[in-house]
Every structure is written in structure tokens, then in C-alpha cells.
């Protein structure tokens, strides 16, 4: 931020004034607007009070019930005012430093689930904590809370006869839905009338407010379904939707399984730079950042491939990395500019070995985490058609050129001629004939990739390997040992989407330089995604890279398939979103 921008922000902050009700710093205009609104609400409330005074007396509502009838902005203002007062009086302190939890909710449930109806253990004292998602009262001497924590829920039964040290009414006066509370009490099972089973509960001796929720939570009946809010306010999504928590628990378990798989096979996990002077290792458009001290532009990494191969040159024969990649490309249902990948490199392995490893890893992972090799998937969302993805071995294998020749009923140029101008004209005509669009630059590589996407990838529902790629599409892959012009590479597809890319690594420095030069020519033709020569990597190859297999997989897409999510935003805790329209007047919470 420039000095001029900083000064502008400073002046804007100086112009703010304190809202005595909410404790926020706001502009004078905003404060006047709020004061007028409060005056109108006060007059309205006065009229309603006068009207109510002449009406028949009805049963009183609890404070929390009355507040639930307010609109969210009124609720926030009232709740903020109450908590501001408690911060001053400390009676009670709404933000205590510590509450000693003696047992988690999962542990409590596992330990006391066997209690019989009406059985209690008043001699056992426990302390639990959680967020209140349900609250109901039965008179002045009985309250029930439903608290959630660690993916579990528990009923809190509060009876005036059990209260100790602190007055019963005082304990519960300021507790609302959404608050995080601590409960000290004893385990038991309720004994409700007219029900065969009671509910496992903690019978509270004391309830303590640990952190108030100032915002009104969505109503229990409707929940939180708005996608925009769920993705922008993931914390609220996690509070309200158990399925969201389960999805990210599954994501964590998937990564744990992958890490254990490679650790148990003597691979070493490593970390490589995320900012580089050259964007290499993949065909993609990079993000550019600037290093102020060195006064130079750097690229956010698009793949860790080149660094990992340098480590194999250095004698680390089995390495892998799980980390973030950054690609300055479009965002859609399966793409996010920032995403997680796993790459591994294994000396003395080729792409045939890697296909076996891929099947072993993913078939085993699916079986271990879901209990079956088959998982349901709805590519268009829960209301759309249902696919069954079968990860059992062996997987189908499709030879790219042979399959296209069969599908399109035409003969392709030989593999070693697919990079020529004649091949380019052939591919252009083929795309035009079949209505396949390819945006400029229409290189041979891009044209062929569009045909593959239209006629092969669209048929890959169950896990499928596509093999037989031309060298021009794979600047870092080794040439095929028996098919001229092709290379030893495969891509694995599931539900029509690529999840893995692997090949026998190119370790011939002379061939590698020639490939880089071809990529440079493509970049000169306007292909922003083409790679440029990385002299540091070439120097490493001059020391000798052993025969090596290299493999990469997108973690996010795999999580999508195993959690039945049809958009990548559902499996990213904080997905990339366009900025919201900002309010005209800035607000700053006063310390």
C-alpha cells in the first residue's frame, strides 16, 4: 500500500465516531441514520406498549423467544448492547479466560450411552463445553439446551434444584442460541413421560457463558442452504450443517491415507519453493508477484515437478510433496485458482509401474474410507442423474490416437509427424468437421487436446487411463520406447475429469533442451501456457537423472468424487469468490 493510500485510510479512520449502542466506529452520517432509526423504533415500541396495556393479559414469552422474532439487524444491535454492558459489569464476564473441560462430547457419549432411562450419576462430576444450537424452556425452573461439539450433540438438562453457587435464573439469563457455553454437572438419562427411552444428558449444576454469539443463527427449521452464504461464511456453514463438517473430515482422512501410503513405501516427504523466477513443471498460466527487496517479479508455482526431479538427481530416490499450486486460469465447477496436489517421483520406475501404483493407491483408499470400491456420484447435483464410480482393479486403458481414429473414422498422421504444419491443417479440419471449437492459438497440441476432451474424456466415467500421448503434448515426458513420436505418459480420468497425470521422466538433457525450444516457439505464437527454458533444471539434468517415474494428482477432485460433491467449492474450506459489494460507510469494532 502506498503512503498516499495509508494517509487516506488514516484520515478516514479519524473521521469516524463511536456508536454508543454497539461500540462500533462509524461515520457521522451513518450514526445519524442509526439514531433516526432507533427513534422510530422507540416510538413504535411505545405505541405497541400502550396498545398492549389495554389488551387482555397473555402468557409471557421468554426473553430469548422474543428476540427470535426480531429481524437479524435488530437482534445484533440488542445483543451487542447486552454484551457491551456485561463487559463493563463482569457479572458475568462474557469472555472468560478459561473453562476446564474434563471430557469431550464424543467421550461423554461413549462412556455413558449405556445409562438406563431415568438413571443418573450425581456422584460423578464432569465438565463439557459446546455451542448451543437448540434451546427450550418449561417454566421458570427447567431449561433444555442442545449443544454441539466435535461432530456430536448432547442435551443439557437444567433444573433449578440442581443449581449450586450461582442463582438458577442468573445462570441462564444471558444464554442464547449460538453461544458457546461450559456446563458443569453429572451424567444421566432423562425420564420423559410418554416415551420409551429417555435422552442421554448432562444434568447441569452450573452453566457458564464462554463466548456469546452476537449474530442471529438461521432458524432451526430452515437451516442454512444458500450457497453464496455457505461458501463465503464457511464458519457458519460448519456451525449449521453437519454434512459440511463430515465432508472436510473425509478430506482430511484422504490426505492422511495418501501420506501414510507413501511413508510406508519409504518415500520422503519434502517441501519445495512456492515462489520461483521461472514458472515451470506444467503447462499453465502463472500468477505473478513482486519481491520488493530484490526488486524482481516472481511466479507462484504451478507445479513442484522440476524441484522434485532435482532432488532425485541429488540421490533422494523416492520423494513426494503435498501442497498448494497456483494457476491464473478460469474458475468453474472443477477448477479453483489455488488448489492442492500430490506429486511423487520414484527412481528406477516407469509409467507402467506408476499405473500399478495409481490403481493400488486409489482402489485401496476408496475401499478403506468408504467400505466399498463403488461410490455414488451426482455430476449435476443431488437432484440430477446418479453415477456409480467403480474403483476396483484393473482400470480400463485407452490408446489416444487409436481410439480417436476409431471414433472419427479417419487415419491420423504418424506420431512423429503430429507437430508439423500439415498435421495442424489436418487437426483444424477435423475439429471444424465435428464442431469442436478451439480458441487461438490453434497449435497442434491444443487442437488434439480439444478432440480428446470431446470424444474420449467424455466417456471416462469409471477410472480410466488414457495413454499414447504425442511428444508435443508432453515436454517433460520420455519418448515412447516403441512408438515414434509418442511418449510414455498416462492421464487418469474419473467421472470425465482428469485426476492424475504421470510419465516416465525425460532424463536425456539433449532431448529436454530441444523440447524446451519447441515450447518457446509455441509461447512466441501466443500460447501463454507453454513452458520456457529452465537453465537451472537443465544444469541438474547434466549431472544425470536416473530412469525415473513421476506422478501428480489433484486432491480436490478426488475429494469431490468421494464426497459426492459436484463443485470444487464444496470441498475447499475457503474457495475463491468474487468480492462482495462493499458498504459505502466503513465500520470498525471498537476495542
Curated annotation (Swiss-Prot):
One term of GO molecular function: lysine-tRNA ligase activity
GO biological process, one term: lysyl-tRNA aminoacylation
Disulfide cross-links: none
Region (Disordered), start-end ranges: 24-79
Primary location recorded for the protein, binned into one broad class: cytoplasm
GO CC terms in record: cytoplasm
Keywords, alphabetical: Aminoacyl-tRNA synthetase, ATP-binding, Cytoplasm, Ligase, Nucleotide-binding, Protein biosynthesis
Low complexity composition-biased segments: 51-62
Reaction it catalyzes: tRNA(Lys) + L-lysine + ATP = L-lysyl-tRNA(Lys) + AMP + diphosphate
InterPro entries, per the entry: Aa-tRNA-synt_II, aa-tRNA-synth_II, aa-tRNA-synth_II/BPL/LPL, Lys-tRNA-ligase_II, Lys-tRNA-ligase_II_bac/euk, Lys-tRNA-ligase_II_N, Lys-tRNA-synth_II_C, NA-bd_OB-fold
Ranges of Basic and acidic residues composition bias in the record: 27-50
Keyword Hydrolase included in the entry's annotation: no
EC number of the protein: 6.1.1.6
SUPFAM superfamilies for this protein: Class II aaRS and biotin synthetases (SSF55681), Nucleic acid-binding proteins (SSF50249)
UniProt subcellular location: Cytoplasm
Enzyme class, spelled out: ligase
Tree of life domain: Eukaryota
Subunit structure: Homodimer.
Family: Belongs to the class-II aminoacyl-tRNA synthetase family.
The protein, known as: Lysine--tRNA ligase, cytoplasmic
Amino acid at each position: 500500500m502506498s503512503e498516499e493510500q495509508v494517509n487516506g485510510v488514516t484520515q478516514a479512520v479519524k473521521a469516524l465516531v463511536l456508536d454508543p449502542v454497539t461500540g462500533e466506529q462509524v461515520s457521522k452520517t451513518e450514526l445519524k441514520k442509526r439514531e433516526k432509526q432507533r427513534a422510530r423504533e422507540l416510538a413504535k415500541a411505545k405505541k405497541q406498549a400502550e396498545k398492549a396495556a389495554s389488551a387482555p393479559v397473555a402468557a409471557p414469552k421468554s426473553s430469548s423467544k422474543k428476540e427470535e422474532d426480531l429481524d437479524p439487524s435488530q437482534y445484533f444491535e440488542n445483543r451487542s448492547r447486552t454484551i457491551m454492558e456485561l463487559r463493563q459489569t463482569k457479572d458475568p464476564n462474557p469472555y472468560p479466560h478459561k473453562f476446564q473441560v474434563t471430557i469431550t462430547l464424543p467421550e461423554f457419549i461413549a462412556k455413558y450411552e449405556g445409562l438406563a432411562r431415568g438413571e443418573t450419576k450425581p456422584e460423578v462430576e464432569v465438565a463439557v463445553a459446546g455451542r448451543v444450537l437448540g434451546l427450550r424452556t418449561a417454566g421458570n425452573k427447567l431449561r433444555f439446551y442442545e449443544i454441539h461439539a466435535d461432530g456430536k450433540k448432547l442435551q443439557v438438562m437444567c433444573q433449578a434444584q440442581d443449581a449450586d453457587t450461582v442463582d438458577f435464573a442468573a445462570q441462564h439469563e444471558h444464554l442464547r442460541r449460538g453461544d458457546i457455553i461450559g456446563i458443569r454437572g453429572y451424567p444421566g438419562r432423562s425420564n420423559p413421560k410418554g416415551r420409551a427411552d429417555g435422552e442421554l444428558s448432562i444434568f447441569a449444576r452450573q452453566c457458564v457463558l464462554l463466548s456469546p454469539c452476537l449474530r442471529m443463527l438461521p432458524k432451526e427449521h430452515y437451516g442454512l442452504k444458500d450457497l453464496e452464504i455457505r461458501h463465503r461464511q464457511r464458519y457458519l456453514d460448519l456451525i449449521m450443517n453437519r454434512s459440511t463438517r463430515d465432508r472436510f473430515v473425509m478430506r482430511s482422512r484422504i490426505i492422511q491415507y495418501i501420506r501414510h501410503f507413501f511413508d510406508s513405501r519409504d518415500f520422503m516427504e519434502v517441501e519445495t519453493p512456492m515462489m520461483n523466477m521461472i514458472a515451470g513443471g506444467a503447462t499453465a498460466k502463472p500468477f505473478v508477484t513482486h519481491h520488493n527487496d530484490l526488486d524482481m517479479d516472481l511466479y507462484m508455482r504451478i507445479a513442484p515437478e522440476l524441484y522434485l526431479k532435482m532432488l532425485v538427481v541429488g540421490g533422494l530416490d523416492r520423494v513426494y510433496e503435498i501442497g498448494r499450486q497456483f494457476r491464473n486460469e478460469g474458475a468453474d465447477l472443477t477448477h479453483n485458482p489455488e488448489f492442492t496436489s500430490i506429486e511423487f517421483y520414484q527412481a528406477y520406475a516407469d509409467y507402467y509401474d506408476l499405473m500399478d501404483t495409481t490403481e493400488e493407491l486409489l482402489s485401496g483408499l476408496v475401499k478403506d474410507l468408504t467400505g466399498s470400491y463403488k461410490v455414488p456420484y451426482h455430476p449435476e447435483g443431488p437432484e440430477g442423474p446418479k453415477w456409480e464410480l467403480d474403483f476396483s482393479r484393473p482400470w480400463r486403458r485407452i490408446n489416444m490416437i487409436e481410439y480417436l481414429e476409431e471414433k472419427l473414422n479417419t487415419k491420423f498422421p504418424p506420431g512423429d509427424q503430429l507437430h508439423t504444419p500439415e498435421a495442424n491443417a489436418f487437426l483444424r479440419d477435423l475439429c471444424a468437421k465435428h464442431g469442436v471449437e478451439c480458441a487461438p492459438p490453434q497449435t497442434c497440441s491444443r487442437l488434439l487436446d480439444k478432440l480428446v476432451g470431446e470424444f474420449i474424456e467424455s466417456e471416462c466415467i469409471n477410472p480410466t487411463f488414457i495413454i499414447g500421448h504425442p511428444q508435443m503434448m508432453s515436454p517433460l515426458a520420455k519418448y515412447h520406447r516403441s512408438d515414434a513420436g509418442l511418449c510414455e505418459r498416462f492421464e487418469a480420468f474419473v467421472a470425465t475429469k482428469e485426476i492424475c497425470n504421470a510419465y516416465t521422466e525425460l532424463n536425456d538433457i539433449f532431448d529436454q533442451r530441444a523440447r524446451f525450444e519447441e515450447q518457446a516457439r509455441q509461447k512466441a505464437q501466443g500460447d501463454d501456457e507453454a513452458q520456457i527454458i529452465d537453465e537451472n533444471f537443465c544444469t541438474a539434468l547434466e549431472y544425470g537423472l536416473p530412469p525415473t517415474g513421476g506422478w501428480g494428482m489433484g486432491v480436490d477432485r478426488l475429494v469431490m468424487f468421494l464426497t459426492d460433491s459436484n463443485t470444487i467449492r464444496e470441498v475447499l474450506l475457503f474457495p475463491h469468490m468474487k468480492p462482495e459489494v462493499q458498504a459505502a460507510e466503513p465500520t470498525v469494532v471498537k476495542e
